[in-house]
């Protein structure tokens, strides 16, 4: 009986897959959807999003000519956001133009200190309802506007230029079930690890210039090819006129087909490193990107950088990280005139700090008068995590994702569960 049922299931899946040919889309296609997603760090997201894709006559499908995305959500742990994106490959002939506008208000923002393991973590002080402690919490608000222009040099190689304006506001949290009298944010100010003029945030103007290369067959769900970007950010401090700096940003992604269209090995390598000037503390956790597909590009850790690590647990002036995963397409079918793929993706992530932030001050002020420890001896190392995810694609470009990850270092990591509407890379 078991053999018979197995044969029926296999035959059914084979029939579904065999008949599940995706028809090219033309013109405008839009997919409004409720945002009922989850992230261990921010809680349950309740909101909505909608993607608008324009495919023209369908010749390049599933690649698009225009993409517009709007989204907004409120999270049960106290944050909310609004995000809009416009991305066009044909609005300006021979060029790609991208712009985005994001506002994010995190009333329970994680702040675990500078330089990763050099900042000790005491779990009993982190959102402890019994003692009313929320030591690793502050209130962070970010408004970010970005515009990027790319134009071919030769073949698949492009030059790019862009500008970004970012306003960050930081304050003590205000939560009725927790006391804000003692927090790491306040302790850092007391010893001037966070300086008075930068404590409440500020406004930055960022210019970027560099190169990109793209040989992917499908931009959002590649079967093969590679993508890389390398550029320099020059950042001017508009608020305090003293925190000007430059950083190098590099991203490399490679997609290796093991069974074409069915099984892909994909990996991503990233580097973000300050090499000149002085950065204000409130910009440490900004992860630079050319195209801000979603609202949350902050903090090394959590669902969009290193899965299995606490959001914002690694904050420094330089980072390197990598993501490695297998993407196995286990089922294809057509339903209600739409094409669906089901994908399983086991993954392995790693991260390291390449440049510490104010290490001498951090070490010097490592012990407060009351004995609270702000710094500890630690050996710089590569931090690793692993987990598994699942994806559902509808018509290739509409993606629902669920991933579970666990880091190998208990000082930095936790079991993280995240839902999203895209691949990590």
Describe these PLM feature segments:
Residues 21-29, 56-65, 91-97, 154-156, ...:
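Short loop/turn motifs that connect adjacent beta-strands in outer-membrane beta-barrel proteins
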Residues 30-32, 46-48, 80-84, 141-147, ...:
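Hydrophobic, lipid-facing positions within transmembrane beta-strands of outer-membrane proteins
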Residues 37, 53-55, 87-91, 150-154, ...:
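Structural signature of outer-membrane beta-barrel channels/translocons
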Residues 218-336:
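C-terminal outer-membrane beta-barrel translocator/porin domains of Gram-negative envelope proteins
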Residues 36-38, 48-52, 68-74, 84-86, ...:
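Transmembrane beta-barrel strands of outer-membrane/channel proteins
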Residues 69-71, 130-135, 192-197, 234-240, ...:
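Extracellular loop and loop/strand-boundary signature of outer-membrane beta-barrel proteins
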Residues 174-190, 195-198, 203-205, 262, ...:
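Outer-membrane beta-barrel transmembrane domain signature
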Residues 23-30, 38-203, 304, 411-425:
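Gram-negative/organellar outer-membrane beta-barrel architecture
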């Amino acid at each position: 009986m078991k053999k018979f049922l197995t044969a029926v299931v296999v035959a059914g899946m084979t029939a579904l897959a065999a008949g599940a040919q995706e028809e090219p889309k033309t013109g405008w296609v839009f997919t409004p959807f409720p945002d009922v997603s989850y992230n261990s760090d921010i809680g349950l997201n309740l909101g909505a999003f909608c993607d608008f894709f324009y495919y023209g006559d369908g010749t390049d499908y599933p690649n698009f000519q225009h993409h517009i995305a709007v989204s907004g959500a409120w999270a049960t742990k106290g944050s909310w956001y609004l995000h809009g994106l416009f991305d066009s490959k044909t609005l300006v002939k021979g060029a790609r133009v991208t712009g985005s506008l994001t506002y994010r208000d995190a009333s329970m923002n994680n702040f675990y200190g500078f330089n990763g393991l050099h900042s000790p973590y005491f779990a009993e002080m982190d959102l402890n309802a019994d003692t009313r402690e929320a030591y690793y919490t502050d209130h962070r608000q970010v408004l970010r506007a970005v515009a990027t222009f790319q134009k071919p040099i030769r073949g698949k190689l492009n030059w790019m230029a862009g500008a970004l304006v970012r306003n960050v506001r930081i304050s003590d949290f205000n939560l009725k079930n927790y006391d804000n009298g003692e927090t790491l944010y306040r302790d850092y100010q007391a010893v001037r690890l966070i300086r008075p003029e930068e404590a409440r945030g500020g406004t930055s103007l960022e210019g970027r210039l560099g190169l990109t290369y793209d040989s992917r067959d499908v931009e959002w769900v590649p079967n093969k090819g590679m993508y890389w970007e390398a550029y320099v950010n020059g950042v001017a401090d508009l608020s305090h006129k003293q925190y000007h700096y430059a950083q190098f940003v590099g991203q490399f992604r490679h997609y290796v087909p093991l069974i074409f269209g069915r099984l892909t090995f994909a990996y991503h390598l990233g580097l973000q490193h300050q090499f000149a000037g002085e950065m204000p503390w409130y910009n440490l956790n900004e992860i630079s990107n050319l195209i801000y597909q979603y609202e949350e590009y902050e903090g090394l850790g959590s669902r969009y950088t290193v899965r299995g690590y606490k959001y914002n647990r690694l904050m420094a002036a330089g980072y390197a990280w990598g993501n490695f995963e297998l993407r196995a397409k286990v089922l294809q079918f057509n339903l209600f005139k739409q094409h669906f793929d089901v994908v399983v993706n086991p993954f392995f992530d790693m991260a390291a700090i390449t440049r510490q932030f104010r290490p001498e001050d951090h070490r010097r002020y490592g012990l407060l008068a009351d004995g609270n420890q702000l710094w500890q001896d630690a050996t710089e190392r590569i931090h690793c995590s692993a987990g598994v995810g699942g994806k559902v694609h509808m018509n290739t470009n509409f993606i629902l994702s669920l991933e579970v990850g666990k880091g190998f270092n208990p000082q930095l990591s936790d079991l993280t569960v995240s839902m999203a509407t895209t691949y990590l890379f």
